[in-house]
Regions:
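Beta-strand segments within the central parallel beta-sheet cores of soluble alpha/beta enzyme folds
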Residues: 203-210, 262-266
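Rossmann-fold NAD(P) dinucleotide-binding segment
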Residues: 54-66, 70-117
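NAD(P)+-binding Rossmann beta1-loop-alpha1 motif at the extreme N-terminus of oxidoreductases
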Residues: 1-59, 63-67, 97
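Active-site-proximal catalytic alpha-helix in oxidoreductases
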Residues: 134-141, 162, 166-198, 207-221, ...
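Interdomain hinge/lid region at the active-site interface
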Residues: 171, 215-281
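Rossmann-fold dinucleotide-binding core
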Residues: 99-178
Length: 293
């Protein structure tokens, strides 16, 4: 059975490795990215071409995949004059692997449906290294029939593919997960900063906290930076702040409010404003050690 032709937009660390995995598995691809070196690397492997526009990419593709930074970028690529919506084929499926605003995802899905195309939101867990080997965690959502249509491809990209229900549930779940994780990291980083300011040994604090129910991989990441000066949680303050902002917006769309998320976002934003945007989230420890009332 012939494999579907895939259009892939977004060749950052994660996207580039996802594309390499698809190429190794014999898929024909049409790709786009602002980074022409990344595009050239993909094309040099064979079985891939560069599309001149999102419209052209959609016209060539059975499945269109996004691995992009923000909802705003996704909307621009979908709705632009030479955008995906202008070229999408009837029966094609769009998959958004990024972390996007659920209401935006639902709107795009509705507009694609009017063209006879489907949509799956499928945000990712794990790292670019996992992407290269097809071992991602994929949180997929959308119409069940559409999901089953693309599941064979998702299974070649993910070790664990979760089906979460209607369109938007994947992005909702990812935002909840990131809200919980980043709030935990920010709180633990301040705990280690408080210990330093008070003259309490950070290693001893970790030994005590990690022997109880607060222990978690996130605590270890925070301890690695605050105590061992090793920054190994590969997620930037800028990205965390973006996701917290999306979570706050999602809660507003749901008719409620999260003061906890707003407080976490406020600390991340202040660290961002201080020039720490590209630092890994546990490095917010440095911001807390310098914070004055």
């Amino acid at each position: 059975m012939k494999k579907p032709t895939i259009g892939f937009i977004g060749l950052g660390l994660m996207g580039a490795n996802m594309v390499e995995n698809l190429q190794k598995r014999g898929y024909e691809l049409s790709v786009m990215d602002l980074n022409k070196d990344a595009v050239a690397t993909v094309i040099a492997r064979g079985n891939a071409t560069e599309a001149a526009s999102p419209k052209e990419l959609a016209e060539k593709s059975d499945i269109v995949m996004f691995c992009l930074t923000t909802s705003a970028v996704v909307e621009k690529i979908v709705y632009g004059e030479e955008g995906i919506l202008a070229g999408i084929k009837e029966g094609a499926v769009v998959i958004d692997f990024g972390t996007s605003i659920p209401e935006s995802t639902k709107k795009i899905g509705k507009d694609l449906a009017e063209k006879g195309a489907g949509m799956i939101d499928a945000p990712l867990g794990r790292t670019p290294a996992h992407a290269k080997d097809g071992l991602l965690n994929i949180m997929a959502a959308g119409d069940k029939e559409t999901f089953e249509k693309v599941k064979p491809v998702l299974d070649e990209q993910g070790e664990n593919v979760f089906y979460l229900g209607g369109l938007g549930a994947g992005h909702t779940t990812k935002l909840i997960n990131n809200f919980m994780g980043m709030t935990t990291v920010v709180a633990m980083s301040q705990a280690f900063a408080a210990a330093k300011l008070a003259g309490v040994d950070g290693q001893q604090l970790f030994d005590i906290m990690s022997s109880g129910p607060s222990n978690s991989p996130f605590m270890k990441f925070c301890k690695h930076y605050a105590v061992d000066n090793v920054s190994d949680l590969g997620f930037s303050i800028a990205n965390a702040n973006k996701d917290l902002g999306y979570f706050v917006q999602m809660m507003d769309d749901l008719g409620t409010v999260s003061d906890i998320a707003k407080a976490t976002s406020s600390n991340l934003q202040t660290a961002l404003d201080a020039g720490m945007g590209q630092a890994n989230v546990p490095e917010i420890f440095d911001y807390f050690t310098e914070l004055k009332k």
